[in-house]
Amino acid sequence: MKDIKIAFFDIDGTLVDFQKKYMTEKTRQTLCALRANGIRICIATGRTPMTVPKFEGVAFDAYLTFNGAYCYDAQGTILSQTIPGQDVERLIRNAAVLHRPVCVSTDKELGANGWEQNLADYFAIGNLVLESSPDFDRLAAGPVYQIMVGTPKEEYAPLMQGITGAQIAAWW
């Protein structure tokens, strides 16, 4: 273990079991042992900073959120890469043509312009409830780090038509 300097961990399905919805004691002890041996431990997730759970007794050295678009540690922001405003607007329009609501996320807030089962199911993975936001237009004006749309693969191409500053990151 002496050559290892840093370790990265996803949350959903890695640190937190999909069925149990919590971190096991064995996982917590392992993370603490890594830190005790001088190995930096970091979260690497598609989640927003506000939805990263706190794990009692575990202090992470850094957080890579929004699939790496917003990275920070205790001292502040390390990297901040937002989606270009014109791409946010275009993606929202494209989703509307497909009759799909979207959820936009800043580093501090998220909000949706509607509700549908696919998007609600995605939110449930992170123990969140999808609700339409009265602040959607303000949030969509940016800065936006992530846009979530509960769409099947066959809708990826029309959803992303004309988008140059963002790409789909999907696992579910």
Task: Please state what every model-predicted region is.
Residues 27-119:
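Active-site phosphate-binding/coordination module
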Residues 9-10, 70-73, 138-140:
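Short, basic/glycine-rich phosphate-binding loops at helix/coil junctions
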Residues 98-100, 105-172:
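Conserved acidic, metal-coordinating active-site core of Asp-based
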Residues 1-4, 65:
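Short, small/polar residue-rich loop motifs at catalytic or cofactor-binding pockets
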Residues 23-25:
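A short acidic/small-residue loop/turn micro-motif
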Residues 3-20, 45:
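Asp-based phosphoryl-transfer active-site loop
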Residues 18-21, 41-42, 80-81, 124-126:
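Short, flexible loop segments at the rims of nucleotide/cofactor-binding pockets, characterized by
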